[in-house]
Amino acid sequence: MDVLASSDPPSSGAFKPELSAALDPLLAFLSKTGSPFLVNPYPYFAYQDDPRPDTLAFCLFQPNAGRPDAGSGLTYTSMFDAQVDAVRAALDAKGYKDVEVVVAETGWPHSGGADEAGASVENARAFVSNLVSHLRSMVGTPRMPGKSVDTYLFAVYDEDLKPGKASEKSFGLFQTTLTETYPTGLMRNGTAGLAPAPAPTVRPASPPPAIPQVTPVQPQPSAASAATAPPRHVRSAAELPRTISALHVSACF
């Protein structure tokens, strides 16, 4: 999100001019190849900059008065939508309306230091579960209604060796025991489905059935037919496996 020079209100979204030399060829490449522009919006850090109760509700998808965008006439009820739409506005301003926005990272820490407001299990659960519900509803964002934004959650596990503040180490959705750090709404059957698979049962191999040996009787050609018949090509034992392998590879492709 640091590539944006402006993001509030979302309609004012614009990239930093000093990054044009790097961004312009990148965006042109994404447009040419039909690839998305990946961003990492974190409402948690927006709340750190403005730790008011109404901001927390806005960041957690909880009921709030909404924030009107005078530039677009739209009203926003979540920081996530506002951040995504600010990137959308920046892309549109550059002329890249065909480049999709994908959220490569977002999340909320379940714990933090005394100076890190909002880093708690309750808030992390609210953010992730409400985000999942919001995405599944397919309501979209005010600027991009009717479709869900592809979103990747950060992170699977905590990073206890990561330097920095305590919150930076505490974004994990799961414990190393394969249990959820808190209910997220992501699992169909809770965490039971994450248990290690049981070892497969190996049955003793049965002996192959005996194949009766049959000696074919070859007809004896007459002298005349033997003299006139064209030579027949009989595939050798070495040729047969090659044919079977070729058929097998073709079937795989």
Task: Give, region by region, the residue ranges found by the protein language model.
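Plant P/S/T-rich low-complexity glycomodules
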Residues: 1-38, 43-100, 111-150, 155, ...
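Catalytic metal-binding/acid-base residues of hydrolase active sites
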Residues: 107
